[in-house]
Amino acid sequence: MKIRHIITLLTVLGCLVCKAQTPAFPGAEGFGMYTTGGRGGQVYHVTTLEDGTQEGTFRWACNKSGTRTMVFDVSGTIVLQSELKIKNGNVTIAGQSAPGDGICIANYPFVIACKNIIIRYMRFRLGNQALKVNPSAHEGDGLGGMDSENIIIDHCSVSWSIDECLSVYGSKNITVQWCIASQSLNNAGHSKGAHGYGGNWGGSGATYHHNLIAHHISRTPRLGPRPGTQTDERMDMRNNVIYNWIDNGVYGGEGMNVNIVNNYYKPGPDTKTGAKGMRIASPGIRTTDYTKHDSSSPNQWDKMWHVWGKYYVDGNVNTKYPQVTEDNWTYGIYNQIENSKVDNTFTQETKDTMRISLPISFEAVTTHTAEEAFERVLDYAGASLYRDALDEVIVNDTRNGETTYTGSGCKRGIINSQDDLKPEGAGDDWSAWPELKSKAAPSDTDGDGMPDDWELQHGLDPNHPEDGKAADSQYTNLEIYLNELVEKITTDQMAGGVVLSGQQTTGIIVPFRSRIFPTSNRVYTLNGSQVGANYKGVVIVNGQKKIQK
């Protein structure tokens, strides 16, 4: 399949907007790619798995203020005793620094309530254990955050939510990339009853790419505007893998501007047949009833009353229904809309205006075909520096079209509690949370986050804590160390892709030169379609226009 995108007029090297900015880390892409997080700030070491406010806990580090980076001197599961809301921004949470199998946050929600945050290689596996003790304990997301700005979530694994698994949305300049959102809990104790939802996605410049969304009843994702961003919702959703959605799948998008490009939809054993199994997305609107438009006091959503979104949809694959792959719009979009549910506003004019021929503006993302993305995501998504037992199950289920776990009264692949994973005959000490073994933390004499041995190898002084803040042309020494820990994953996951970005422009549309594979020699026509190497005519090769005869 060709990568069929209209892409930006400017090459990466010539981009006037971004040339002076440094990505959050190598491999950071999309609208949140220039988040700075804790760059150049203080370093806080998490030295214990206990939850509390004492020095060395994760909660203590989260509650600190000022520009900072959290590194881990231990691996394992941190069982929260109450919700943890991080309110002070300018922070990097470097899960890849944990010695051993990594970190998991459990039992209570972790909520992003700050600006300028980088989170990498973490697990958030909520569970309903706290609700069994106290039914009003929480109704949380696995990883949530909204009404903020400058956020990038990279290589995180999220599961067992009471509400949605992964709902980082309604903010400005955000990226969620290379994550796994799986096994939301169905009947886990939510006050509204059955849930089992993947997440709400959207924002004023929001990118979601190369994520795996598996084993959910609905919202895989919900395209969800927020009151503060509803008039400027711009979202790019590409190269995601969506498996075993049971009912609604992707829907919403009221008044949003959305690219849905090269995603891989794989219906599972109990995904509904017919239209919902064919679904790419079911766009909706804010109806009269929803907005109270005809009342004396319309609500906050009324400003988007009857406003249809605009969508660029191309290159998406459905493994069960080839007609959807061949014609994304007829079967995957138009046939999903029930006119009676949108105040009978779904007319031919609506069809014509909601479908756009150029993508909405989006920041650079290494883009694969949907089929390539399926393999890349299954190989590298989630907290994959060490992939734990649950992620292994989710990936294998997705690859093989299987459902390893099912809860009582649930559709195949859906669970009510993490305890539904308990094998027959397991003892009282069994835990659903995968064991994460720790190793001894490397010696870091000056506490700057970089091991002594690494500092010596790079000509630094292990007794000089300011070394970590020193910078080359782009990154601090601490960032260079943290980036090196996952360098191979970053390089391998992007192989075979082309770095694309897009603006709605006039004139010739020129593909980006790939920053990762600058000599890939892929050939494009002037409208952005990839063609064979022997194509004759005016083409673009590595960001340069040429004539092939």
Kindly label every feature range from the protein language model.
Residues 1, 20, 506-511, 528, ...:
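Terminal processing/anchoring signals of secreted or surface-associated proteins
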Residues 23-70, 525-531:
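Acidic Gly/Asp/Thr-rich repetitive segments characteristic of extracellular carbohydrate-active
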Residues 427-504:
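Extracellular calcium-associated, cysteine-rich motifs in secreted modular proteins
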Residues 498-525:
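Residue-level detector of functionally pivotal "anchor" positions at catalytic/ligand-binding pockets or at interdomain
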